[in-house]
Regions:
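Catalytic-core regions of hydrolytic enzymes
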Residues: 1-111, 169
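Active-site-adjacent mobile loop/cap segments within catalytic or ligand-binding domains
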Residues: 3-6, 14-17, 76, 80-90, ...
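Solvent-exposed beta-strand motifs enriched in subsets of small alpha/beta binding domains
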Residues: 8, 189-234
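Extracytoplasmic/secreted envelope proteins and their assembly/folding machinery
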Residues: 35-38, 42, 67-70, 97, ...
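Sec-exported extracytoplasmic/periplasmic mature domains
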Residues: 39-50, 74-78, 117-125, 176, ...
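A structural preference for short, hydrophobic beta-strand core positions in alpha/beta folds
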Residues: 54, 130-133, 229-232
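Residues embedded in well-ordered beta-strands
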Residues: 98, 145-147, 201
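Active-site-adjacent substrate-binding region
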Residues: 108-132
């Protein structure tokens, strides 16, 4: 049976105050960045034997209650829950990434947080603020759970990373690589079926002059194709 991963893009498009300062790309909603990272994680893991769900509204129109996110996670019987966020602080020099587990979390929660924290900093090139504990309600689900903060929306240095596609890709790769390692995920096995009773041929061109046919044959062979021949039809 495949493992179950639940991803959670924090907040929603209309959540008050959850946005970047007005930087070089303007003001960007936190949820849009969180959603981008979640989608990139899903894309990275598409070839792995894992079932993935989201607890947030994937249109961003509604900020789902934390209690509802927990309920959904539990209903999915998740093995792993990861909430994706970006940080903010009144001190505009605050920088770096950090990963939270619940204050009453398990050893597995700590193991996962300690695994993701340095990887997230390494991939994004931002300061590692470490793994921490907090009483975040969304982390009270039954699954092993962490909340990731991928850089400060209120700091120019971090803003220039987290608002880019490459920065969000780095965030996603860090989390995805840790998920693969933590859950011991394997790539899906693809079984090819072969019908030995049928043979398929590819025909490339028809010509009135044999010289033109010979020229095309030579071009195909030069390109690395084998089994090329000229069939003469009367």
């Amino acid at each position: 049976m495949s493992k179950v991963l639940v991803l959670d893009a924090g907040h929603g498009l209309n959540t008050a105050g959850k946005e970047t300062y007005k930087g070089s790309k303007g003001v960007i909603k936190e949820w849009s960045m969180n959603d981008s990272v979640c989608r990139k994680i899903q894309s990275i893991l598409k070839d792995y034997d894992v079932t993935i769900y989201r607890t947030d509204d994937t249109t961003g129109k509604n900020d789902i209650l934390l209690s509802e996110r927990v309920r959904r996670c539990n209903n999915y019987n998740a093995d792993l829950f990861i909430s994706i966020h970006h940080n903010a602080y009144s001190n505009t020099t605050a920088t770096g990434t950090e990963v939270y587990m619940h204050v009453n979390g398990t050893k597995e929660d700590k193991k996962l947080a300690d695994l993701v924290a340095p990887k997230l900093a390494q991939k994004t090139g931002l300061k590692n603020r470490g793994s921490k504990k907090a009483a975040f309600a969304v982390l009270t689900c039954k699954a092993t759970a962490i909340l990731c903060e991928g850089g400060f929306m209120t700091t120019k240095k971090d803003y220039e990373v987290i608002t880019t596609d490459s920065g969000q890709q780095a965030y996603a790769e860090a989390v995805a690589e840790c998920i693969i390692s933590f859950l011991g995920l394997k790539k899906k096995q693809i079984t090819a079926t072969t019908n030995t009773n049928k043979v398929y041929q590819v025909i490339c061109g028809s010509y009135n002059q044999r010289s033109n046919a010979e020229k095309t044959k030579a071009q195909l062979e030069k390109a690395g194709f084998s089994g090329v021949w000229i069939n003469v039809k009367q």
